[in-house]
Amino acid sequence: VTLIKPTRIKQSKGALDAVLHGRVVAVDPASGAASNPGYCVMQSGVIQEYGILRVPRAKTINLRLKAIHETIRDELPEADLLVIEDIPAFFLQKFPHSCKPLLFSCGVIMAAKPWPFVLPIQPSVWYSIVDKIIPGKRANYNKQDEHDALMLAVTAYTLAANQPKVKTENLLLPQGLDIGRLVK
């Protein structure tokens, strides 16, 4: 596994090719008993599918993480690149009880398949893309786990496809993106 920083995606030919011409799987992690991971599959810059992975409920975090691992392993396709939410360190300090299981979930997702590249993207980065494509910006974003996973994939594509900088005008977005579904 090669971890790629979002700011370095254009310098990594393998990761850049994976995003623009290969299969990308994006996962919005979940760890709580009531939440499920969102996912998005994108092939050569075209959104193929996105939704929620139904993970069986479990009594302990260990069993929940095992169920997340098995669900990712069994239900998601192999991919050239995994995009996952990068949980900022200050979240861990501010919300330790909810953030630790979320970080564990990220590790379990990364270990579930032999992803050649992993692109962790912080929420502030993909929210900046939300602000560029959603009318009314983040206030009108319909925040759901599957939409968050979709935005992770859209952000990976946007960072890779837009040279040299991501600008609102003439923004290249993946095909098959229905922005209307992301609006409240």
Enumerate the predicted regions with their spans.
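Phosphate- and other anionic-substrate recognition elements at nucleic-acid/protein interfaces
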Residues: V1-K184
